[in-house]
From Swiss-Prot:
Belongs to the LppX/LprAFG lipoprotein family. The gene is lprA. It is a lipid-anchor. Modified by Lgt on Cys-25 with an S-linked diacylglycerol, signal peptide is removed by LspA, Cys-25 is further modifed with an amide group on the amino group by Lnt yielding a triacylated protein. Upon expression in M.smegmatis non-glycosylated form and glycosylated forms are detected (by concanavalin A binding); when only the mature sequence is expressed from mutated protein only the non-glycosylated form is detected. Keywords: Cell membrane, Glycoprotein, Lipid-binding, Lipoprotein, Membrane, Palmitate, Signal. A lipid is attached at C25 (S-diacylglycerol cysteine). Constitutes a host TLR2 agonist (toll-like receptor), shown experimentally for human and mouse. In host cells full-length (acylated) protein acts as a TLR2 agonist, inducing human and murine macrophages to produce cytokines, inducing murine dendritic cell maturation and cytokine production and inhibiting antibody processing in murine macrophages. Binds diacylated phosphatidyl-myo-inositol mannosides (PIMs). Does not induce murine macrophage apoptosis or necrosis. Non-acylated protein does not act as a TLR2 agonist. The lineage of its organism: Bacteria, Bacillati, Actinomycetota, Actinomycetes, Mycobacteriales. Pfam families: LppX_LprAFG. This is Lipoprotein LprA. GO terms for cellular component: extracellular region; peptidoglycan-based cell wall; plasma membrane. Residues 1-24 form the signal peptide. It comes from Mycobacterium tuberculosis (strain ATCC 25618 / H37Rv).
Amino acid sequence: MKHPPCSVVAAATAILAVVLAIGGCSTEGDAGKASDTAATASNGDAAMLLKQATDAMRKVTGMHVRLAVTGDVPNLRVTKLEGDISNTPQTVATGSATLLVGNKSEDAKFVYVDGHLYSDLGQPGTYTDFGNGASIYNVSVLLDPNKGLANLLANLKDASVAGSQQADGVATTKITGNSSADDIATLAGSRLTSEDVKTVPTTVWIASDGSSHLVQIQIAPTKDTSVTLTMSDWGKQVTATKPV
């Protein structure tokens, strides 16, 4: 069996680490269209909203995710990703991603099923089994109530309501704060900051329709960089079969 080049393996690993770690985002165009309003709630309201969002996120077992990256984020090869993930009864994910393989940008499709990551990276239309995903990255971390998005919401520091916005077409309350760099590293599968950085500026957009769903989260690991994840279709059940 011919093994894929190391650069392709590394990029495929990046798919796995990001698709279910940070995954999904609205574009900058969406952010540009969002109209800020004066903050209508106190910082106490921010804590309450984050608590409600945390509780809601802990109950999510599947969703659609979109990821977008601005700037050169350390240790992050994926620049764009869109896919679906669910963790009940087992972790399954499908989607597509754009990655840096060496100095070249490549598009790839991926399927994660039965504990294996399959991708056509480097061979469009022909899938390669990149092995047991659990040995590369714990793909269930995104929806893990103790390590994933729920954990970030529960531990967002210096939280403050920054107004109301439309995020991905959903009415939301925008909250700014800071996340632990270690928590971000756990979620991303690799450290996105230097070792001496302790916190990462984080902004979240929480649905104001009563569901308290986390619609969007954006982190700024380093100067002039950002990673934005947008969620939808909460509760979605994802199915997939091993690619032929």
